[in-house]
A protein has these predicted regions:
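Solvent-exposed loop and edge beta-strand segments that line ligand/cofactor-binding
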Residues: 48-67, 78, 82, 86, ...
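Loop-centered beta-sheet repeat module
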Residues: 17-70
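Long, well-ordered core segments of solenoidal/helical folds
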Residues: 20-43, 87-105, 147-164, 221-234
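Flexible, glycine- and charge-enriched loops at secondary-structure boundaries
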Residues: 16, 20, 83, 87, ...
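CBM-like carbohydrate-recognition segments
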Residues: 113, 117-118, 124-242
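Conserved catalytic-core motifs characterized by acidic clusters
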Residues: 40-48, 109, 171-177
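Well-ordered alpha-helical scaffold segments within catalytic/enzyme domains
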Residues: 2-15, 64-82, 125-139, 196-211
């Protein structure tokens, strides 16, 4: 895949330029076909022989796309000619995905369909990517830190007493109807959830070493410097005023 090709640039210095060019070419061709600009999301599949393509925005597929962009940006030199274009796709995708986070912190199996179930593995991938992007300075901690924090809190709540990750969709191919995605089973033995949860946890540790989240009333606010007080900037006065 694209990530593997990009990573090869680390190990074969003589062929580094070739591998980077191929990884970027694949990413941009993928995005050109799969990214839906008006949604800020990736479709799950694309059929070359069809004029109309399925537009089901499966959560974990969007996770893999976001993770691929992260891994590509990690290895592309700052002055690489097409780095800015890859970054533009990444940031547009971040905006599209974060706008659809549920109030519980998880994301839905079909991202833009709130009646589809909440899914753990995709959420863990997003948490990793968002935390990583904040740590790298690609996106703003003030805007995206609280979303990331909420996502991690939700993911952590899906780890049961046996250390199993609950709520992970099993392997899923492309489909042409929504019911297929709605009724895909979840299973604690679906391995897709474990790696992302470990990655997300490790990146959150790094994030919390670099940023200083603080409760402000009932909202999480992210600060780049440690605050002198733990008292909220504002709070709701719940006491009744007496005449």
């Amino acid at each position: 895949g694209i990530s593997a090709v990009a990573q090869m640039s680390y190990y074969d210095k003589e062929q580094k330029d070739k591998y980077l060019a191929e990884a970027v070419r694949q990413f941009l061709q993928f995005a050109d076909r799969m990214f839906i600009p008006e949604k800020g999301l990736y479709r799950h599949g694309w059929v070359e022989s069809s004029s109309d393509h399925p537009a089901f925005c499966w959560a974990r597929a969007n996770g893999w796309a976001m993770l691929t962009a992260c891994e590509l940006l990690d290895v592309l030199p700052e002055d690489y000619p097409q780095r800015a274009k890859v970054m533009d796709y990444f940031r547009a995708h971040v905006r599209g995905v974060t706008a659809l986070q549920s109030g519980e912190g998880l994301w839905h199996q079909l991202l833009d369909r709130n009646d589809s179930y909440l899914e753990t593995s995709a959420t863990a991938i997003y948490v990793y990517c968002l935390a990583h992007a904040i740590n790298k300075g690609w996106i703003d901690a003030i805007a995206y830190g609280p979303v990331t924090h909420l996502g991690w809190h939700a993911v952590a709540g899906k780890i049961n007493a046996e250390g199993q990750v609950e709520g992970t969709c099993v392997g899923t191919g492309m489909a042409f109807d929504p019911a297929f995605y709605y009724y895909r089973p979840v299973n604690v033995y679906a391995a897709h959830g474990y790696g992302p949860v470990l990655w997300a946890g490790a990146e959150m540790i790094r994030l919390l070493k670099n940023q200083y989240p603080q409760m402000n009333d009932s909202a999480v606010q992210y600060y780049q410097v440690k605050q002198k007080t733990t008292a909220p900037i504002f709070a709701i006065d719940t006491e009744e005023k007496k005449d």
